[in-house]
């Protein structure tokens, strides 16, 4: 080093081990200026030359760490900002990546971020609670990450197939590349074993916990030692504090010189330090392996697992070793477990597991069925409480456990008739182990089954109805019905009347909407035509659904003391009658129950059931050809325009002022599952066709009547919509088919009307959905012919003097007695002014109706009369007001003076002039 910078000493300081030259403080009198003072950090730091790879990768890891922190706090906006910066940083490191390959930690963050965004996207409840910025950022970032990950699709796929290998490779690579890395980085990119166990499962056993603790301690020691080594290599001036103090006296220029080993001794010292560091690292690894081998020899065989693979959990110890398992001990442990139920932070899955283990212990120690039944009750209740949110449905595995547990409980109750369960039994009066007396357990099996039915409904409500998953869940209904039937048999023997009514209602609710195809087939096939084997099979199948519904409902009618259960039973009974085309029984039961008078006071689920029943009643009447009854039954539902909502099959779009989020959640819980839905297009088609068959003849009969009423406003609305269209093409939708058929019927063209109502498109949309589709189509053709005949006679009666009934029969393809009957009814009801000539079989028109010209003259006269009446009324009104005003002013002129006198005089003058 040049001696230009040294003023107070001619020799170099040999006390420094690193070989750094120390110079004394310059004499102050030479320049008269103080040297530049540096902070301690600047004094102690050393300029280190780093490779471009380290710089770029460190920039990427810092951004990844920020993204992971934002993911933890659900800050999607921050994730979006950092992801954009991450993409730019990766672009800068592209040249290095091309040489070295895509780093694993970069692939990991891309895969984790995409999974995280998909999880947020599927969480509908969480999305609703997001603020506007986060929701917008979520949508934007989800699109960007999906587009960005296409370039890394193969890397991400290989990472997801074996994430453990990726973690191991990264760990080894980090150890080789950067020996000064801390455990904090590992926690950011991966999850340590201890952290994983804390997150995923309960604490491990004692030996494994000790083993993991040693590993963590070694990591901490290695971290400290590596930091110390880095400190040693960073300070090349001295090893002692005194030498550091002396080093502070170096000249200003020497502080900014880049330190590098210039002599052979310096190079040898640096190499020796590197060798010492590698040796220490090797010693640490060997020491760790030796300790692992000792643990293997002492505590059995240990298996090294890769990061991310969950350890096999050992069964928790319920009782201390050597404890005598008695009834009191088990009940005490049960109460301890139940005390944590419902508390914040309680692991519900672990609680269920503990209860199941307690059942096994009770069974192994032969503590009796009473204790097992009590624990089973609590297991089922814990399964129901697994989801604290009412809107959340049970997971499939929990649902399966629930069904199995209820079946096991019913097996025990049927196998042990001496066990009595009931919610009126106090815990103090329970008898769980005294076999000399009947066993008494507090609990209600009916409540558990009712809750099971509610959970099944929630599962069906929250499953996509068009997926295979819905079909799989629907198969569970057979198990649900079997459990309800078993509980029904049990309660018929040991339950109260109220409990029997409740379980009967559950059985009815799972039966009323199902069409009994076997019973229907037996009705179509007479007993004489069926073989003996078929008759025996029919007898073995048990009672028909009609007989079952009759028996269950009659019991409720007679025994039930609550109006709600009886009302639901009546509505289900009517629905079942209507579904099986027993129109008169369904109608009579509805009229005798008088439900339509006070149904508005019922709760919403019962009102939905009433609406469903009325709709099914109207469809039943339509199948029987009773179009007027069908129209009246469907009028209230269809005229409101809210059929979907009234039937509990969905919500209509409304403004937020009409429904808040809480109301929307409540209404969604009231929706019926998809397999109970009534086809809304079929419902509307039945209503419009019924309205067409009623409205078109009525319009033809009262064509000249300006004050005629409308039977169906919705049907007239559809007609007006069809008339407003400037260009009419072939009908496509169901409504267009009905409108086109109505126009054809208005002209008396029944064949065209028939072709619009019954064709392949309408068959696929509507008519094939009926159980007896051919019968319905035959009925429709007959009704179209009859109503077209009536419309033809109303429209063209003024044209004919007489018309032969045979001609009408041939024209509308009806037999002569039917034509005779229709015309006779029209004459009797004074709808058609004509008479029948029996010898000639002709209809003689009386021409009492005015002609078209006379109708126009009558309409003109009526309008002129109304115009005159209006003019006279207006004139009288004006005269009365003016006269009263004049008299008041005249009176004021007589009695008052001044201004009022002058005003009255002026008005009197104007009146005289007028």
From Swiss-Prot:
InterPro entries: EIF3C, EIF3C_N_dom, PCI_dom, WH-like_DNA-bd_sf, WH_DNA-bd_sf
PTM annotation (Phosphoserine): residues: 9, 11, 13, 15-16, 18, 39, 166, 178, 181-182, 910
Mod. after translation: Phosphorylated. Phosphorylation is enhanced upon serum stimulation.
Biased composition (Low complexity): 8-21
Single Gene Ontology MF annotation: RNA binding
Annotated localization: Cytoplasm
Residue list for modification N6-acetyllysine: 99, 644
Residue spans of biased composition, Basic and acidic residues class: 199-216, 261-278, 887-900
Source taxon at top rank: Eukaryota
Phosphothreonine: residues carrying this PTM: 525
Biological process (GO), any one: translational initiation
Gene3D superfamilies assigned: Winged helix-like DNA-binding domain superfamily/Winged helix DNA-binding domain
Residue ranges, compositional bias (Acidic residues): 166-190, 217-232, 291-300
Domain PCI, chain residue ranges per copy: 674-850
GO cellular component, one term: eukaryotic 43S preinitiation complex
Region: Disordered, residue numbers: 1-44, 157-302, 523-543, 886-914
Keyword Phosphoprotein included in the entry's annotation: yes
Keywords associated with the record: Acetylation, Cytoplasm, Initiation factor, Phosphoprotein, Protein biosynthesis
Record-stated family: Belongs to the eIF-3 subunit C family.
Name of the featured protein: Eukaryotic translation initiation factor 3 subunit C-like protein
GN (gene name): EIF3CL
């Amino acid at each position: 080093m040049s001696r230009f910078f040294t003023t107070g000493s001619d020799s170099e300081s040999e006390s420094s081990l690193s070989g750094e030259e120390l110079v004394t403080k310059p004499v102050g009198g030479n320049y008269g200026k103080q040297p530049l003072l540096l902070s301690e950090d600047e004094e102690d730091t050393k300029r280190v030359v780093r490779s471009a790879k380290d710089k770029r990768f460190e920039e990427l890891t810092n951004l990844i760490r920020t993204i992971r922190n934002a993911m933890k706090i659900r800050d999607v906006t921050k994730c979006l900002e950092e992801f954009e910066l991450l993409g730019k940083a990766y672009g800068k490191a592209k040249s290095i990546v091309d040489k070295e390959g895509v780093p694993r930690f970069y692939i990991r963050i891309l895969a984790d971020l995409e999974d995280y965004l998909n999880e947020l996207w599927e969480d509908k409840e969480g999305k609703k609670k997001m603020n506007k910025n986060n929701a917008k950022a979520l949508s934007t970032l989800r699109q960007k990450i999906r587009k960005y990950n296409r370039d890394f699709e193969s890397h991400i796929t290989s990472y997801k197939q074996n994430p453990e290998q990726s973690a191991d490779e990264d760990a080894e690579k980090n150890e080789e590349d950067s020996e000064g890395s801390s455990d904090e980085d590992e926690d950011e990119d991966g999850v340590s074993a201890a952290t994983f166990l804390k997150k995923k499962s309960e604490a491990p056993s004692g030996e494994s916990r000790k083993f993991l603790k040693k590993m963590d301690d070694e990591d901490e020691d290695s971290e400290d030692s590596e930091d110390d080594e880095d400190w040693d290599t960073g300070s090349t001036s001295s090893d002692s504090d005194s030498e550091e103090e002396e080093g502070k006296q170096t000249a200003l220029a020497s502080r900014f010189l880049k330190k590098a080993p210039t002599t052979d001794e310096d190079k040898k010292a640096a190499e020796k330090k590197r060798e010492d560091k590698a040796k220490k690292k090797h010693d640490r690894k060997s020491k760790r392996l030796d300790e692992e081998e000792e643990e293997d020899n002492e505590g059995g065989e240990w298996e090294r697992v890769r990061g991310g693979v969950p350890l096999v959990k050992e069964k928790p110890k319920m009782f201390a070793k050597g404890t005598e398992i008695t009834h009191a001990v088990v009940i005490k442990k049960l109460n301890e477990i139940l005390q944590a139920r419902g508390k914040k932070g309680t692991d519900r899955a672990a609680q269920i597991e503990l209860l199941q283990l307690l059942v096994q212990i009770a069974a192994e120690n032969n503590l009796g069925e009473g204790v097992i039944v009590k624990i089973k009750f609590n297991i089922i209740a814990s399964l129901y409480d697994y989801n604290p949110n009412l809107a959340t449905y049970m997971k499939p595995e929990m649902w399966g456990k629930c069904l199995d547990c209820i079946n096991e409980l019913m097996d025990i109750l049927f196998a042990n008739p001496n066990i009595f369960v009931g919610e009126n039994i106090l815990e103090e009066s329970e008898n769980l182990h005294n076999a000399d007396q009947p066993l008494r357990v507090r609990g209600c099996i009916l409540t558990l089954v009712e809750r099971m039915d509610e959970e099944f409904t929630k599962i069906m409500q929250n499953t996509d109805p068009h997926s295979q998953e819905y079909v799989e869940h629907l198969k569970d209904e057979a198990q649900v019905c079997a459990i309800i039937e078993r509980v029904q048999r049990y309660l018929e023997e040991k339950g109260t009347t109220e409990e029997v009514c409740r379980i009967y209602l559950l059985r009815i609710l799972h039966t009323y909407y199902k069409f009994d195809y076997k019973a229907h087939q037996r009705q179509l096939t007479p007993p004489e035509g069926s073989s003996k084997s078929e008759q025996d099979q029919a007898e073995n199948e048990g009672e028909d659904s009609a007989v079952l519904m009759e028996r269950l409902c009659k019991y409720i009618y007679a025994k039930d003391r609550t109006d709600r259960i009886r009302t639901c039973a009546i509505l289900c009974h009517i629905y079942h009658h209507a579904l099986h085309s027993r129109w008169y029984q369904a109608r009579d039961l509805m009229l005798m129950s008088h439900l339509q008078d006070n149904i508005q006071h019922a709760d919403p689920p019962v009102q939905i059931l009433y609406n469903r029943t009325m709709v099914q009643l109207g469809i039943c009447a339509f199948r029987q050809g009773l179009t007027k009854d069908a129209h009246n039954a469907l009028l209230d539902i269809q005229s409101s325009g809210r059929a979907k909502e009234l039937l509990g099959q969905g919500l209509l779009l409304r403004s937020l002022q009409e429904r808040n989020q809480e109301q929307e959640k409540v209404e969604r819980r009231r929706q019926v599952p998809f397999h109970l839905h009534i086809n809304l297009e079929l419902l509307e088609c039945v209503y419009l066709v019924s309205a067409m068959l009623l409205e078109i003849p009525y319009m033809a009969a009262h064509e000249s009547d300006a004050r005629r009423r409308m039977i169906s406003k919705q049907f007239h609305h559809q007609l007006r919509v069809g008339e407003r269209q400037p260009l009419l093409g072939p009908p496509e939708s169901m409504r267009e088919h009905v409108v086109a058929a109505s126009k054809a019927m208005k002209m008396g063209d029944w064949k065209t009307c028939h072709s619009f109502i019954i064709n392949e498109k309408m068959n696929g949309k509507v008519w094939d959905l009926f159980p007896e589709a051919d019968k319905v189509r035959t009925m429709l053709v007959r009704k179209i012919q009859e109503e077209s005949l009536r419309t033809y006679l109303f429209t063209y009666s003024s044209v004919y003097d007489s018309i032969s009934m045979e001609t009408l029969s041939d024209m509308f393809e009806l037999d002569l007695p039917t034509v005779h009957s229709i015309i006779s009814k029209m004459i009797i009801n004074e709808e058609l002014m004509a008479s029948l000539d029996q010898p000639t079989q002709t209809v003689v028109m009386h021409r009492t109706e005015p002609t078209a010209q006379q109708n126009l003259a009558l309409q003109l006269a009526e309008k002129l009369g109304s115009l005159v009446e209006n003019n006279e009324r207006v004139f009288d009104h004006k005269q009365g007001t003016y006269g009263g005003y004049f008299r008041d002013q005249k009176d004021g002129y007589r009695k008052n003076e001044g201004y009022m006198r002058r005003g009255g005089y002026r008005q009197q003058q104007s009146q005289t002039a007028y």
